[in-house]
Amino acid sequence: MDISLTGRSAIVTGGSKGIGFAIATSFASSGGDVAIVARGQESLDDAVKRIRQSAKGKVTGVAADVATAVGVQKAYDGAMAAFGKVDIIVNNAGTSATGPFEKLTDEVMQTDLDLKLFAALRLCRLVWPQMKERKWGRIINILNVGAKAPRANSAPTSVSRAAGMAFTKVLSGEGAPHNVLVNALLVGLIEADQHVQAAKKKGIPLADHIAAMTKDVPLGRIGRAEEFANMACFLASDAGSYITGTAINIDGGRSPVV
């Protein structure tokens, strides 16, 4: 099956590292034009350089903090200046803050909502009219399996992701008559910079950290970012033209719910 994004342009937030970088790379190597958005200019420049090595489409970087309305507007303006249109949105920016409810402050909750939920809402609001007008659009919200099966001590992350899943379903219903397809991809244990940082914080080797995490993964290993990106690329292409309003676990079978 040929997966092509030739002639399509995409915004990938949180696109300089991990899953976002893998998705941007997959899109670009499939012929799409890609604007990657990240806060750090140095990591952004490095990511753009690396993606261009295998890209068939254009690649640009936009330094912006999508946790703010100003930052989202900057990301949108950068993509429009580079490509003149946006066909695909990947709302990937976010962190995985967790902890006991009793220590969850309003500030921590709002920070997580701003980066995960409001960033997606604002970017979709900006791009939505042109997607409807062209009768073609793809929106992919990157959440995690906690959106379906939240565990104790998993707020604020699981709470904001659950809201993101509801947002996905609402948009899918409104977009379907206009061929704007909206889906969510739910992260399980996937290779990412956050695992490297977590291992450093614990003062243990990365391999030991990963081994402990993957004990309850039926496939017995951590997933590769490229494996996650493959599904995103499929959903963004014409090959995924009859899929909307769903949330797909990419977790090696770890989630207790389908």
Question: What feature does the model see in each segment?
Answer:
Residues 129, 173-177, 241:
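Alpha-helical segment proximal to the catalytic Tyr-Lys
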Residues 73, 77, 96-110, 153-156:
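Conserved mid-core segment of classical short-chain dehydrogenase/reductases
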Residues 1-3, 19, 149, 233, ...:
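Short C-terminal tail/terminal secondary-structure segment
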Residues 9, 16-18:
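Conserved glycine-rich cofactor-binding loop
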Residues 124, 160-161, 168:
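Active-site helix of classical SDR
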Residues 101-102, 149-155, 177, 220, ...:
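Active-site loop immediately N-terminal to the catalytic Tyr-X3-Lys motif
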Residues 100-101, 105-113, 139, 209, ...:
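Substrate-binding pocket helix/loop in short-chain dehydrogenase/reductase
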